[in-house]
Amino acid sequence: MDIKLVYSTSDPVGLTIKKLGYSFEEIDEDVTDFHYKNGEAIVIFSRHESKASIPSLTVHYPGNPSEEVMGGEPKKLGIAYPRLLTSILREIKKIDLDIEKTMEATHHGPTYQNVPVIFVEIGSDKTYWTNERIVRTLVDSTLKGIDKVDETDCRDYISGFGGPHYSKLFTKLADESCIGHVISKHYVDKLDDKVIIQAIANSVNNINKVVIDSLNLKQRERIIAALKSFDIHIQLR
């Protein structure tokens, strides 16, 4: 598979990658709204920002589950590639650094691509974005994950609804299964059926299991009803 590795010169992590001399695809657009579409899959490196400023290495898919948009289009999810994201995440989790390693729920753009896009991010401030040792370690682990994608074991292909934005549950499930879109609890009440269906259908690998994390009865019933046309196992947590 032709997997393109991408960075943006408008992003501090991208500038660090360029300084380190990696021969990846270079763009100058905002990472949340870029239009690069080459290859059969795209892995883009970028900064991660959070109010808590917790040092972190994260992976996630792009997509806007509601009308609220940060790049891309409203109520549109990107294409997930569970086997690839999980292979990368498993390698990141092996990094011997005292830094949080986690999967984030699907958020922000772009949503224009008809190939899967995976974000690999470093948080949460300039100290980490420009740290050449950390950036190099993350990039090299990502490359290992890409190299191992075809041998990645997936007990199930899982999409998720509920839980926090930084999901310990789905990060843990990735040890044995491969993870598609995760829609956090913050968006659940704003979802329409089309987005719920996209969370299953927009995937390179066929999703065979949905995990619903800590949602109330009304929220669970609505998601289950939207997925009634799918032959899929639903697990409540």
Swiss-Prot record:
Which superkingdom heads the taxonomic lineage of this protein's source?
Archaea
Q: Which GO terms describe its molecular function?
A: D-aminoacyl-tRNA deacylase activity; zinc ion binding
Q: Report the cofactor remark.
A: Binds 2 Zn(2+) ions per subunit.
Does this entry carry the keyword Protein biosynthesis?
no
Primary gene name: dtdA
The record describes its quaternary structure and partners as: Monomer.
Which example biological process does GO assign this protein?
A: D-amino acid catabolic process
**Protein name (Swiss-Prot/TrEMBL):** D-aminoacyl-tRNA deacylase
List, alphabetically, the Gene3D superfamilies matched.
AF0625-like
Give the cofactors, semicolon-separated. Answer: Zn(2+)
Q: Which SUPFAM superfamilies match?
A: AF0625-like
| HAMAP family per the UniProt record, alphabetical | Deacylase_DtdA (MF_00562)
Quote the function comment for this protein: D-aminoacyl-tRNA deacylase with broad substrate specificity. By recycling D-aminoacyl-tRNA to D-amino acids and free tRNA molecules, this enzyme counteracts the toxicity associated with the formation of D-aminoacyl-tRNA entities in vivo.
Please provide the record's keywords in A-Z order.
Hydrolase, Metal-binding, Zinc
The record, for InterPro entries, names: Deacylase_DtdA_archaea, DtdA
Reactions accelerated catalytically = a D-aminoacyl-tRNA + H2O = a tRNA + a D-alpha-amino acid + H(+); glycyl-tRNA(Ala) + H2O = tRNA(Ala) + glycine + H(+)
> Which protein family is named in the record?
Belongs to the DtdA deacylase family.
- Give the residues annotated as coiled coil: none
Q: Identify the species of origin.
A: Saccharolobus islandicus (strain L.S.2.15 / Lassen #1)
Enzyme class (EC, first level): hydrolase
Matching Pfam families: tRNA_deacylase
Mind telling me which NCBIfam families this protein's record contains? Answer: PRK03995.1-1
EC number(s) for this protein? 3.1.1.96
